[in-house]
């Protein structure tokens, strides 16, 4: 499927049993799997948080306008061309401990820095707006080559963006110094709320 971007937008608590109750049956739910992408791990973590009543966080849908659809069969339809209605902001939002949270997820294979080109100006503006309203904003950054995950506060990202004029890169050491490491966990495999808790403690 061809996707066309709009012009100018290139750039807590735990329960004893991790179960999900559905109707008359009770299912054991596992929320960890190694070797998957960052977004997949976040999605599984969000499922775990929801099942255990820790937080309600969802991936934001991306609105598109369909231009062309093929019908290879009467019972099937395949979108072959579409474009985004508007520039996307961040990947996830929800509610945690009575607070609105909003964050993005980024990966890099670079071992020494994180390129700011991974962000767009409208995303930085969006995170600034979240902070101005008392919300919680951050970025989950994964250094894939190092298998390290960090919760990087939006306030630090905004400061670096302004300092570097949205160009160049944030050094790995800067991110390590100003971020909160996401500890390795079995279930979920990416327990990012543990790092968010530490971030909130430090900010207050």
From Swiss-Prot:
Keyword DNA repair recorded: yes
Positions that bind Mg(2+): 89, 91, 104, 123
Primary site of residence: cytoplasm
EC number: 3.1.21.10
Top EC group: hydrolase
A GO CC annotation given for this chain: cytoplasm
Catalytic activity: Endonucleolytic cleavage at a junction such as a reciprocal single-stranded crossover between two homologous DNA duplexes (Holliday junction)
Transition state stabilizer, annotated site positions: 106
Cofactor dependence: Mg(2+)
One Pfam family named in its UniProt record: RecU
Cofactor binding, note field: Binds 1 Mg(2+) ion per subunit.
Compartments reported by the entry: Cytoplasm
CDD domains to which the protein is assigned, alphabetical: RecU-like
Cross-referenced InterPro entries: Resolv_RecU, Restrct_endonuc-II-like, tRNA_endonuc-like_dom_sf
GO annotation, biological process: chromosome segregation; DNA recombination; DNA repair
Keywords (A to Z) from UniProt: Cytoplasm, DNA damage, DNA recombination, DNA repair, Endonuclease, Hydrolase, Magnesium, Metal-binding, Nuclease
GO molecular function, one term: magnesium ion binding
Function: Endonuclease that resolves Holliday junction intermediates in genetic recombination. Cleaves mobile four-strand junctions by introducing symmetrical nicks in paired strands. Promotes annealing of linear ssDNA with homologous dsDNA. Required for DNA repair, homologous recombination and chromosome segregation.
Family: Belongs to the RecU family.
Listed name of the protein: Holliday junction resolvase RecU
Gene designation: recU
